[in-house]
Amino acid sequence: MLKGLYTATSAMIAQQRRTEMLSNNIANANTSGYKADQGSMRAFPEMLLSRIESKSPAGTSRTEIGSVNTGVYMQELKPLFTQGSLKSTDQPTDIALIENQVPMSAETNEKAALFYPVQTADGIRYSKSSTFSLNENNQLTINGRPILSTDRQPITVDNENFTVSENGTVTTNGRTAGQIDVRMAEDVRNLKRDGNDLYSTADGNDLPSAAGNNQVAYSLKQGVSELSNVDVTSAYTEMTEAYRSFEANQKVIQAYDKSMDKAANEIGKI
């Protein structure tokens, strides 16, 4: 009896995690460059049931009577790195990173992904956000974190009257302030989310620069913002499915609770 209780409980926990993932995706639907998390349900290994043959002298002969599933769990979440829609804003601090060509991993059949490197207190992190701003030192930043140039230095401009070419060269008042660096993750499985807008590498190593890589073609578009790739309609539909599944397993647990209560309080009186 308890096996069924454990199975229903694991399903509730899995659906709760799924709901949290979908809620976070929906909450960031309007966040520039946000990449939707995705996850899939997996079953725990099945347990093989058998019984001991009572006629066997040694009592060691067994007959298989079937198997039982021991529950489900939600696999580790991973972002979906497909490019979001592009929106023209005419704001000089909106700079979209457009992936024209990136290599495909032969092992995972997934495309590589390009990122802006930013400097944080914990080291270099990587962002897909296209919304830039200037800090008090007139450095180009993403959410207050300086964007690094190909020389691994922050890029300082005189004011918001600067231009960015398609290869990332920043010009302000007639001088070149630097070239915005772009890094490439060949295997996106090596990335882990660090907050909603940053990523880091699982092994702690820096991503290689995409500049000069003949397998990569990209362009930077000033005055253009990349939107999130969250499909809000699909997310709400999945949210409804998760709620219904959660409630169904909740009812199963309530039924088990009533059965165990009857076994403990009524059958025990006989």
Swiss-Prot record:
Keywords in alphabetical order, please: Bacterial flagellum biogenesis
The answer to whether UniProt assigns keyword Metal-binding to this entry is no
A single Pfam family it belongs to is Flg_bbr_C
Q: Indicate whether Phosphoprotein appears among the record's keywords.
A: no
State which residue ranges cross the membrane: none
Q: Name one GO biological process term.
A: bacterial-type flagellum-dependent swarming motility
InterPro entries from the entry?
Flag_bb_rod_N, Flagellar_basal_body_rod_CS, Flg_bb/hook_C_dom, FlgE/F/G-like
Cellular component terms, GO, for this chain's entry?
bacterial-type flagellum
Job description of the protein: Not required for motility.
Entry's family note: Belongs to the flagella basal body rod proteins family.
| Protein name, UniProt field | Flagellar hook-basal body complex protein FlhO
Q: What are the leading ranks of the lineage?
A: Bacteria, Bacillati, Bacillota, Bacilli, Bacillales
- The protein's gene is named flhO
